[in-house]
Regions:
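Short, solvent-exposed loop/linker segments at the N-terminal edge
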Residues: 65-74, 163-171
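Short, solvent-exposed loop/turn segments at the edges of extracellular beta-sandwich modules
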Residues: 35-40, 134-141, 233-238
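Flexible, low-complexity linkers/stalks enriched in Thr/Pro that connect modular domains
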Residues: 19, 45-59, 136, 145-160, ...
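Short, surface-exposed alpha-helix to beta-strand junction/turn motifs within ectodomains of secreted
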Residues: 1-2, 76-103, 132, 184-195
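Surface-exposed, short loops/turns at beta-strand junctions within beta-sandwich domains
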Residues: 19-27, 117-126, 217-225
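Aromatic sugar-binding surface patches on proteins
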Residues: 10-17, 106-116, 208-215
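Solvent-exposed serine/threonine-rich low-complexity stretches and specific carbohydrate-binding patches
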Residues: 2-12, 96-106, 198-210
Length: 239
């Protein structure tokens, strides 16, 4: 409980300010007591009100972006979940792009919106999700939420042209290329397939500046057109 004293003013009126910030949310019972100068106690008067001061927060476990990785310009879906009913999370962003929420006139625990992925430099691997601008029904402004690496930007791979190969060079065909948004520890898989769908594979890791290279042994493949591909998933799980 909290208590406060005051004195009676002219015409029997009185007033006071109570600090209830340390009390629990819910029903608050307020009473007033006093004894006059003749020692006679007044009958206690009382009332109640509802206290709601806990700020709404984002439920991290139920907040998501779909898909979890995308290229610049793609549209992704943001589902934001809160621990209580809130107003529209106005001003929320993915990176610097504003999220367009589905309009509702009421407060709710879940808000769904769409946003277009902004263009970013090749060195940028992910975007941050920021949720803010929401209030509960009592007018308490929510705690701003920030999630780094919320959306992975799709990495890229290139493969340099490979010249024709004869029997002498088939055991070690050099393949190389470039990449963006991979770490030097990330693994790539290179595959060579002949016209009979027989294949050979080789793994390598990305080197400095996104470059990569490997040597393929295609001596066991059939003469003719050989199709070579490279694939990989970066440390954020984006292929």
């Amino acid at each position: 409980e909290v208590t406060q004293t005051t004195t009676v003013a002219a015409l029997g009126k009185w007033n006071a300010a109570l600090d209830v910030s340390g009390l629990k949310d819910g029903t608050i019972t307020v009473t007033v007591n006093g004894t006059n100068d003749l020692g006679a106690p007044a009958e206690e008067a009382g009332t109640t009100f509802t206290l709601t001061q806990t700020k709404p927060t984002v439920d991290d476990s139920q907040t998501s972006i779909n898909p979890t990785y995308a290229v610049a310009g793609a549209e992704v879906k943001v589902t934001a979940t809160f621990d209580k009913d809130v107003t529209t999370p106005t001003g929320s962003t993915l990176g610097t792009a504003a999220i367009n929420w589905t309009a509702h006139s009421d407060t709710r625990t879940e808000w769904v919106g769409m946003v277009n992925v902004e263009p970013v430099a090749d060195s940028v691997k992910s975007l941050t999700l920021t949720l803010k601008g929401f209030q509960d029904a009592a007018g308490n402004t929510g705690v701003e939420y920030r999630l780094d690496n919320a959306l992975a930007i799709t990495p890229t791979l290139t493969l340099e042209k490979i010249g024709d190969v004869n029997e002498a060079g088939a055991a070690s065909v050099a393949v190389n290329g470039n990449s963006t948004r991979f770490e030097t520890s990330d693994e790539l898989t290179i595959k060579a397939v002949d016209t009979d769908n027989k294949e050979v594979t080789q793994t390598t890791t990305v080197a400095a500046l996104g470059k990569w290279n490997a040597a393929l042994d295609v001596s066991g493949l059939k003469d003719g057109t050989i199709t070579v591909t490279v694939n990989g998933t970066n440390d954020l799980g984006a292929p």
